[in-house]
Every structure is written in structure tokens, then in C-alpha cells.
Swiss-Prot record:
It comes from the Eukaryota. SUPFAM superfamilies: Apolipoprotein A-I. InterPro entries: ApoA_E (IPR000074), Apolipoprotein_A1/A4/E (IPR050163). This is Apolipoprotein A-I. Its main location: secreted. Participates in the reverse transport of cholesterol from tissues to the liver for excretion by promoting cholesterol efflux from tissues and by acting as a cofactor for the lecithin cholesterol acyltransferase (LCAT). As part of the SPAP complex, activates spermatozoa motility. Major protein of plasma HDL, also found in chylomicrons. Residues 69-265 are annotated as: 10 X approximate tandem repeats. GO terms for biological process: acylglycerol homeostasis; cholesterol efflux; cholesterol metabolic process; lipoprotein metabolic process; phospholipid efflux; positive regulation of cholesterol efflux; positive regulation of phagocytosis; positive regulation of phospholipid efflux. Residues 1-20 form the signal peptide. It is found in: Secreted. Gene3D superfamilies: 1.20.5.20, 6.10.140.380, Apolipoprotein (1.20.120.20). The modification Methionine sulfoxide is found at M195, M241.
């Protein structure tokens, strides 16, 4: 049953996105496109920073000095060209994502409704579990209070006695909490299975009715993406050409120099 619960959770999070997290926390949800855009921006910025470090280390090496590619001299040109590509591609990806987000909205609404019903059913058990957990911890603290006094006033011999007293208390707390966890798992099992069956039913209905339609629309979006991206990628290629030609000349010059040295030996 634990495995089923994990699979269920992952499936719900995958299909509903971060909306589930905002649902539980009652936060204002961030749009799907904003989440993707922020993630990609952070990733690309980190990639550019780390790439510059690698290039700097390479140029400082013996081979880098010998080749003298001067990549860092052209780094600003490369960065600006790459940034321009990002700016040109952003609206294309945004439209693609918004279209897909709109088309899958009905399914996500149904799943969020199922999740709302599940939350209402299991919330009393979660509240009860939290209450019992706090009671057990408070009881443990009360039992520990006199032992703390003994610890402050005790000798080495008393320390050993305290250790013997602490052992059963720790085991008692552990066993109590474990029993509460087991009870909670048992109480939630029917609802977990119910949600799993609902999810399977929703996916089966999607497969029978709209899967072919989604596949066709996804293919259309990808074809449109390729067509719309062609001008931006061509501009990117044109911007890279001077830099690549400079690299080529540097490599050829380094190879020519190495050949001359070998022939002169």
C-alpha cells in the first residue's frame, strides 16, 4: 500500500503541477508558464556562469595557452548572441506552453476537485494524528523533567543510572509514535486507494476519448514551434559564424605551428 501511495502522489503532482502544493498551503498559485520560465532562466544563467569558469580554466592550461583560442575575448559576443536567441524563442515557447496548459485545463480541474474531496476526508485524521503526536511529546517532556534535575546535580554513578532510565522512556516514545503512524496509515489506506482508482479512471477516460486529439494537437504545436524557431536559429547561427571562424583560424594556426616544430626536429 505504501508503494501505491507513492505512485499516487507522484502521479497527482505530475498532472496537477505545483497547483497541489498551493492548494494545501492556500497560497496564491503561480502560473504554469511563470514556473517554467523562472526555472529555465535560473538554469541557463547557472549554465552560462559555470561554462565561463570552465573556459577560463581551459585557457589557463598548457593546451589552452598553446592553442590560444581566445574564447573569453569572444565571450561577451557569445553571451549576447545566446541572450538574443533566448529573447526570440521566449514568446514561441510561451505560446506553446499556454496552448498546452489551456488544453489540459479540464483534466487538471477534475483532478483538483478530486484532491479537494480527498483533503476534506483525511483532514480529521491528520488533525487527530498531530494532536496525539503533541500529547506524546509533551508527556515525554514531563517524564524527562525530573531526570534533567538529577543530571544537573548528579555524579558519574548517577549518570549511568540516568542512562538506564532514559532508555525505556525513549523506547516508549518511539513505540507510541510508531503506533500512531501505523494507525494513521490504516485510516488513510481506503482514501488512498479511492484516489488511486479515481486517477486510473480519469486516465482511462482520457485515453479512450481525447488521447488521439491531444497527440494531434501536440504534433501541431511542435511543427509550429519548429517553423517559428527557424528565423531565430538562423540569426543565432549567423551571430556565431564570426566567432567560429576565429576559433578555426586559431586552431589551424596552432596545428601549423606544431607541425613546423615537429619538422624542424
Amino acid at each position: 500500500m505504501e508503494t501505491k501511495a507513492v505512485v499516487l502522489t507522484l502521479a497527482v503532482l505530475f498532472l496537477t503541477g505545483s497547483q497541489a502544493r498551493h492548494f494545501w498551503q492556500q497560497d496564491e498559485p503561480q502560473t504554469s508558464w511563470s514556473r517554467v520560465k523562472d526555472l529555465v532562466t535560473v538554469y541557463l544563467d547557472a549554465l552560462k556562469d559555470s561554462s565561463r569558469d570552465y573556459v577560463s580554466q581551459f585557457e589557463a592550461s598548457a593546451l589552452g595557452k598553446q592553442l590560444n583560442l581566445k574564447i573569453l575575448d569572444n565571450w561577451d559576443t557569445l553571451s549576447s548572441t545566446f541572450t538574443k536567441l533566448q529573447e526570440q524563442m521566449r514568446p514561441i515557447f510561451q505560446k506553446l506552453w499556454e496552448d498546452l496548459d489551456k488544453e489540459t485545463s479540464p483534466l487538471r480541474e477534475v483532478l483538483n476537485k478530486d484532491l479537494e474531496e480527498l483533503k476534506q476526508k483525511v483532514q480529521p485524521y491528520l488533525d487527530q494524528f498531530q494532536k496525539k503526536w503533541q500529547e506524546e511529546v509533551e508527556l515525554f517532556r514531563q517524564k524527562m523533567a525530573p531526570l534533567g534535575t538529577e543530571l544537573r546535580e548528579g555524579s558519574r554513578q548517577k549518570l549511568q543510572e540516568l542512562q538506564e532510565k532514559l532508555g525505556p522512556l525513549g523506547e516508549e516514545l518511539r513505540d507510541s509514535l510508531r503506533s500512531h503512524v501505523d494507525a494513521l496509515r490504516t485510516q488513510l489506506a481506503p482514501y488512498t486507494e479511492e484516489m488511486r482508482q479515481r486517477l486510473a479512471s480519469r486516465l482511462e477516460a482520457l485515453k479512450e476519448s481525447n488521447l488521439a486529439e491531444y497527440h494531434t494537437k501536440a504534433s501541431e504545436h511542435l511543427s509550429a514551434l519548429r517553423e517559428n524557431a527557424k528565423p531565430a536559429l538562423e540569426d543565432f547561427r549567423q551571430g556565431l559564424m564570426p566567432v567560429l571562424e576565429g576559433f578555426q583560424k586559431s586552431v589551424l594556426a596552432a596545428l601549423d605551428e606544431a607541425t613546423k616544430k615537429l619538422n624542424s626536429q
